[in-house]
């Protein structure tokens, strides 16, 4: 059975890595080693010396192969759309590119699956060493992987998983780097149980874009975590990851006098919108709000009492690991089929130990 590498985002490690990687400003292009000037013909080395130098050069070449020295690989990074999260992800990508001396070419699909497929095919025609893919949706991701296989170009997936496996493992991928969305959804359920205790209550679920892997699997994990508890989801609606839409959803529920004591959101944008609506209605003390993601606004909202808890993982670390894993594969090193980056709980007691990245 193949192993899954799990990386818990420990408080100190996540914060230090976020600060360190975000501050890297090196170029993503490879730097060529200076050329060695040949000795004049009249100063030919002795035979024994030449042999020794040749042996030494061969050993150094072998060492370079095993230690993964910088090589000028070209990696296409395909992003699904513009969000603050992917700005932070790119910080990690760029830092790793500078560290490993590879060239990165970006493409943003603007949340259009057909556009992303066309972008991927363009890179296949131009020629790249590897495609690092954060797909718009799983279906389009599968098409890209199939097309890339036909073009003999390896694909690594990150952030958004492809296929139905909860772990993110998918045949045809070099590897998947990111969170297990089912586990992530379960964390929000555990936060809800911690906040409400044994009394439980009635929950509103505000979801992301319908049909996306995060929306489907986060809901699945939440429902699994709430099994056997006294917390019942009585209403769910999509906000499409948008703060204003979540605010409107909660305002409408308040006007309808629906009774609930917790709002569980699949992202921090929605949570801050829900919390704002409750605060403006004078109901925040009676209703708990839970977010997901650990954004700057989300962490600040926990500090300000607008929301009561969220989750955290490092987007910078995720971007760095995507390129690090890609380079290892291109260098012929063994990589695991999945590298999981875990979300951890954030509450008012520990929020000051986390640093928002996006």
Model segments located where?
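Bacterial N-terminal signal peptides
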Residues: 12-20
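A residue-level marker of the well-folded mature domains of exported/periplasmic proteins
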Residues: 2-5, 17, 24-358
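Alpha-helical transmembrane segments
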Residues: 4-12
């Amino acid at each position: 059975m193949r192993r899954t590498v799990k990386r818990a985002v420990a408080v100190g490690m996540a914060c230090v890595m976020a600060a360190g990687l975000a501050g890297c400003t090196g170029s993503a292009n490879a730097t060529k080693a200076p050329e060695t000037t040949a000795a004049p013909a009249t100063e030919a080395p002795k035979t024994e010396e030449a042999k020794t130098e040749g042996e030494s050069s061969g050993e150094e070449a072998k060492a370079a192969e095993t230690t993964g020295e910088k090589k000028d690989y070209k990696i296409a990074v395909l992003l699904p759309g513009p969000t603050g999260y992917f700005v932070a992800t790119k910080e990690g990508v760029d830092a790793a590119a500078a560290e490993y001396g590879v060239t990165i070419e970006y493409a943003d699909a603007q949340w259009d699956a057909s556009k992303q497929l066309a972008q991927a095919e363009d890179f296949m025609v131009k020629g790249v060493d590897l495609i690092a893919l954060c797909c718009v949706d799983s279906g389009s991701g599968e098409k890209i992987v199939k097309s890339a296989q036909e073009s003999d170009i390896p694909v690594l997936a990150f952030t958004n998983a492809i296929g139905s496996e909860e772990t993110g493992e998918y045949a045809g991928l070099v590897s998947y780097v990111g969170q297990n969305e089912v586990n992530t959804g379960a964390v929000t359920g555990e936060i809800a149980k911690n906040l409400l205790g044994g009394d439980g209550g009635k929950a509103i679920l505000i979801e992301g874009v319908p049909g996306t892997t995060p929306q489907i699997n986060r809901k699945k994990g939440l429902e699994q975590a709430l099994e056997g508890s006294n917390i019942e989801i009585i209403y769910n609606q999509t906000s499409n990851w948008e703060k204003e839409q979540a605010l409107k959803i909660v305002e409408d529920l308040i006007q309808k006098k629906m009774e609930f004591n917790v709002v569980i959101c699949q992202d921090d944008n929605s949570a801050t919108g829900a919390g704002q609506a409750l605060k403006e209605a004078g109901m925040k003390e009676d209703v708990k709000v839970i977010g997901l993601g650990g954004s700057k606004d989300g962490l600040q909202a926990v500090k300000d009492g607008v929301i009561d808890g969220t989750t955290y993982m490092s987007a910078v670390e995720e971007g760095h690991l995507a390129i690090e894993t890609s380079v290892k594969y291109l260098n012929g090193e063994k990589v695991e089929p999945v590298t999981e980056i875990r979300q951890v709980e954030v509450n008012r007691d520990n929020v000051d130990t986390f640093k928002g990245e996006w």
